[in-house]
């Protein structure tokens, strides 16, 4: 990976994206809500029951600019769910700021193993025994 791309990833201005798609939220409090899902690449938790093990290796997914990610979400749904992998391996501030400028409701699905970044309307915390949440995960 070149230095420029690495810097964009560190700043959260670009992210490894496995997939992004419009669908109906199928679980939890917002079940049945039309949503746009953004699935980030990268996860070091290693849950043996994971249904998206393909997301674990961040290097196997394209690095996409936040501008492009947000552009693709425009007009599809007012609810955006960021999931993974483990999205909090990355700085979510630029993505959520850009989504908020479009008046999107931002939801995240996380293990809580990394510090919370971003501006979220809904946090779905799913602790994992393999890598426990950091204490701050319970304070937000």
Question: Where on the chain are the PLM-derived regions?
Answer:
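Active-site beta-strand/loop signature of hydrolases that rely on acidic residues for catalysis
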Residues: 83-85
């Amino acid at each position: 990976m070149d230095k420029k791309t690495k810097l964009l990833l560190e700043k959260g201005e670009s992210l490894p994206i496995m997939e992004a798609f419009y669908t109906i939220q199928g679980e939890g409090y917002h079940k049945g809500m039309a949503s746009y899902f953004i699935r980030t690449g990268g996860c070091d938790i290693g849950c043996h029951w994971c249904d998206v093990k393909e997301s674990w290796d961040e290097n196997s997914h394209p690095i996409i600019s936040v501008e492009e990610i947000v552009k693709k979400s425009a007009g599809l749904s007012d609810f955006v769910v960021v999931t993974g992998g483990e999205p909090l391996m990355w700085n979510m501030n630029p993505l959520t700021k850009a989504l908020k400028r479009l008046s999107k409701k931002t939801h995240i699905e996380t293990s809580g193993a990394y510090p919370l970044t971003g501006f979220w309307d809904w946090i779905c915390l799913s602790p994992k025994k393999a890598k426990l949440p950091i204490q701050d995960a319970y304070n937000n």
